[in-house]
Curated annotation (Swiss-Prot):
Taxonomic source organism: Ruminiclostridium cellulolyticum (strain ATCC 35319 / DSM 5812 / JCM 6584 / H10)
One cellular component (GO) term of this entry: small ribosomal subunit
Organism lineage: Bacteria, Bacillati, Bacillota, Clostridia, Eubacteriales
GO biological process per UniProt: translation
Protein name: Small ribosomal subunit protein bS20
Gene3D superfamilies per record: Ribosomal protein S20
Length: 85
């Protein structure tokens, strides 16, 4: 444990941010999974794809994912969506 007051605060802040990022990343994974399931079943594909791309863009904007990772995931979802049509 740190002894300096500012270091103690940094530990608390980092724990809080880690928890928040974990929650956001989990929600993102769920959204992507729902999009993939929608593509397989063929129901509400455009809505699911829109939600997934929006979530990926938000995650990239908040530095939860790297922007290139988000772009790659969006590209792969779009490719799967077009292949399913």
């Amino acid at each position: 444990m740190p002894n300096i007051k500012s270091a103690i605060k940094r530990v608390k802040v980092n724990e809080a941010k880690t928890l928040e990022n974990t929650i956001r990343k989990s929600a993102l994974k769920t959204t992507i999974k729902k999009c993939k399931e929608a593509i397989v079943t063929g129901e509400n594909t455009s809505d699911a794809y829109t939600a997934a791309t929006k979530a990926l863009d938000k995650a990239a904007a908040k530095n939860i994912l790297h922007k290139n990772t988000a772009a790659r995931k969006k590209s792969r979802l779009a490719k799967a969506l077009n292949a399913a049509k």
